[in-house]
Amino acid sequence: MESGQPARRIAMAPLLEYERQLVLELLDTDGLVVCARGLGADRLLYHFLQLHCHPACLVLVLNTQPAEEEYFINQLKIEGVEHLPRRVTNEITSNSRYEVYTQGGVIFATSRILVVDFLTDRIPSDLITGILVYRAHRIIESCQEAFILRLFRQKNKRGFIKAFTDNAVAFDTGFCHVERVMRNLFVRKLYLWPRFHVAVNSFLEQHKPEVVEIHVSMTPTMLAIQTAILDILNACLKELKCHNPSLEVEDLSLENAIGKPFDKTIRHYLDPLWHQLGAKTKSLVQDLKILRTLLQYLSQYDCVTFLNLLESLRATEKAFGQNSGWLFLDSSTSMFINARARVYHLPDAKMSKKEKISEKMEIKEGEETKKELVLESNPKWEALTEVLKEIEAENKESEALGGPGQVLICASDDRTCSQLRDYITLGAEAFLLRLYRKTFEKDSKAEEVWMKFRKEDSSKRIRKSHKRPKDPQNKERASTKERTLKKKKRKLTLTQMVGKPEELEEEGDVEEGYRREISSSPESCPEEIKHEEFDVNLSSDAAFGILKEPLTIIHPLLGCSDPYALTRVLHEVEPRYVVLYDAELTFVRQLEIYRASRPGKPLRVYFLIYGGSTEEQRYLTALRKEKEAFEKLIREKASMVVPEEREGRDETNLDLVRGTASADVSTDTRKAGGQEQNGTQQSIVVDMREFRSELPSLIHRRGIDIEPVTLEVGDYILTPEMCVERKSISDLIGSLNNGRLYSQCISMSRYYKRPVLLIEFDPSKPFSLTSRGALFQEISSNDISSKLTLLTLHFPRLRILWCPSPHATAELFEELKQSKPQPDAATALAITADSETLPESEKYNPGPQDFLLKMPGVNAKNCRSLMHHVKNIAELAALSQDELTSILGNAANAKQLYDFIHTSFAEVVSKGKGKK
């Protein structure tokens, strides 16, 4: 990974012992594999891809992302596989897709394309060897992937279906979730492989990496801020429960509020009644989100960034007049005081009286107050420094291991990686000062005081902060001593260090390093930061003088556009030392597999975590939730009753039966004594773009054939006369605002006798187009209800259907089609917005026809007769009033039209003045 040299391409490691066992079981019997996060669901999928990369096979892969597909193809290319998987996208024309399928091998295709190809028999269903499903926890009944699997099983009884997922927690929601997923997958077997599985645990224990847990203590001000935020969170949760007694109390606990999925949990409960909630409840939900962000910023970033966020929150509240109640709590005051105390110190303020301090700070914020900068360093930074120094010391004596080891530092996101890079290259003081200048440029006097103070006190503080005991017996005593922080001192506390004690640093070296840190110019650090990889060669940094030979890479754990970027770095660099600056469960497991796949090669993992913090609690909660999810799955598996016909390899599986005819349906006995009639097969013409929704799947399930074509007018053609335009609520509002719906209604009304607007809404997310107030307040040009009313007035033949779900829509379509002729796909395809091929449009131009309909006395009933008698507007103007009466069949309408055409503008103006 040195500059100028291309990255080494390393093939994926061979399967581990327990993975081989699972593959053998899965080869024997199809099933759903649920493994723990990070334990290699992607490795299992890759192995099955490798097995079927042959022209004699045809294997479809569902639910993969483009980045994952590219990664798998590249890995197979490195392995030397000749018949590589191919990707079927919109770039491949529909006519050439059949040839791609018949060439065999592994096919990555989007769900929409596969659905269309199955329905049009463009894919040879009987030749498909099997289907591999990734992220199987997402396979619900109405999704596209379930539709594909159902079509596959209806046409192919021999092919295999194997599904993989590493998200056990997803099965924890709903009733019998895993059983419903297995039903949609048409599999009978459930394979559970948690981390505590006997085979997994025993194998990984034999090859476990050396782990050094470093529990970093937060500074007193950080602890005070964390306590204040937790108090405010607790108060907000109590108030939320008070305003909404129906909410589940267990899920709204403080422990869950700290975890990552809390936002989804609370929205899950509140979405069905969101439009009914008061402003207070909505404000509380927003406050909870902000407070969770504050907790993350506290442990993740520096003191300046945290204070900047706090001050911006308060400024926003003042600017927009919003009233967040938590800002006026005592805990909020404590949080602001301690956040400011981490950045600067006001000499005149007395810490004994909190209220006076806050008042003084508020008053003096706008004045030229002489502040003494404190710029408290992040304790994890100093812990990272200690780790890097230890690695340097070991690398000096690493000849037995084949030379110095590479170092990989992993942090949560790009921003943290950027800060770590700046900290390593500039040093804490220079980096924080530069950040302070960017954020608070006005306080130039505070910088001068701080620089003077730091130069006087620098050597004494740095010596003490880096001091380590010489013998191991004094380690506990030294740690205890380090926990007590005095005024003006910011020290690192290592409460647990499983490693060799380092030798005492030379005082002169530290002083020299510190001076060089401060003298580093902020401009010397490049501003542009790579988002996916940060390469930092620490040998050029005079502040530390460590890692002269090996390369140090700082990489984000989350947020990369390539999900396998970190995996690539891990296998290409092959680091001997990995520093986990932030705890992330998936990557911890990935490191275990990485170590187990390289037996004999050392790997040391430094685990940096704030002891007793919300960060630690989040990590432990994630572990506990996954363990509980697997325990629940084990209990469900033990009591699960799986029918023999579940796999659908014969005709006895009822899930493969189409149609909804039941025994209690009334029969018309007037027709041949009630004998069963062989009616025509129902069909609906569906626009290609509609296959992104679940409605086509449900229509097909009801026994109605689907003909997918690209329609320009309408989304669904139910009969030769009935055209349906489907809109969701958000789409409806957007189409009404930009005028697109008006144009669509014009086209539908022109070419179909029964144009229909279908408005489909989600039952779990109710909505209200009108408020609870009086109706007259809603009548306006901007109101949705008013626009819908105008639309119906403009198009009298337009019918509006309201459906609470796609299931209800499918049932409604079936009822609308009863005893009606079937639509013709070729005719529907020929209709375009400018089409003139229909019988009604062969004689008349749409433009003049619309113009004619806007004239007084002309309506939809007499318009056709009028156009039949006159060729153009000029002929119409030449007709007398009697002739118009005979054509229109109504004297009043004829008089209105005649007066409109022949009355001059001057006469109209004079009549208007006369009325006044």
Curated annotation (Swiss-Prot):
PTM comment text: Acetylation at Lys-911 by KAT5 promotes interaction with ERCC1 by disrupting a salt bridge between Glu-907 and Lys-911, thereby exposing a second binding site for ERCC1. Deacetylated by SIRT1.
Entries under SMART domains matching the protein: ERCC4
Region feature Leucine-zipper 2, mapped onto this chain: 270-298
Location(s) in or outside the cell: Nucleus; Chromosome
Broad enzyme group: hydrolase
Required cofactor(s): Mg(2+)
Record's keyword terms, sorted: Acetylation, Chromosome, Cockayne syndrome, Disease variant, DNA damage, DNA repair, DNA-binding, Dwarfism, Endonuclease, Fanconi anemia, Hydrolase, Isopeptide bond, Magnesium, Nuclease, Nucleus, Phosphoprotein, Repeat, Ubl conjugation, Xeroderma pigmentosum
Positions of modified residues (N6-acetyllysine): K289, K911
Region entry Disordered, spans: 460-487, 502-526, 660-679
Motif range (Nuclear localization signal): 486-491
Residue ranges with Basic and acidic residues bias: 470-483
Residues in the signal sequence: none
Leucine-zipper 1, as annotated region: 233-254
Keyword DNA-binding: yes
Region spans: Helicase-like: 1-457
Nuclease: region residues: 658-813
GO molecular function: damaged DNA binding; DNA endonuclease activity; identical protein binding; promoter-specific chromatin binding; single-stranded DNA binding; single-stranded DNA endodeoxyribonuclease activity; TFIID-class transcription factor complex binding
Region (HhH2, dimerization with ERCC1): 837-905
Gene Ontology biological process terms in this record: cellular response to UV; DNA repair; double-strand break repair via homologous recombination; double-strand break repair via nonhomologous end joining; negative regulation of protection from non-homologous end joining at telomere; negative regulation of telomere maintenance; negative regulation of telomere maintenance via telomere lengthening; nucleotide-excision repair
Transmembrane segments: none
Listed NCBIfam families: rad1
Family label: Belongs to the XPF family.
Function: Catalytic component of a structure-specific DNA repair endonuclease responsible for the 5-prime incision during DNA repair, and which is essential for nucleotide excision repair (NER) and interstrand cross-link (ICL) repair.
Subunit (UniProt): Heterodimer composed of ERCC1 and ERCC4/XPF. Interacts with SLX4/BTBD12; this interaction is direct and links the ERCC1-ERCC4/XPF complex to SLX4, which may coordinate the action of the structure-specific endonuclease during DNA repair.
Full protein name: DNA repair endonuclease XPF
Organism: Homo sapiens (Human)
Underlying gene: ERCC4
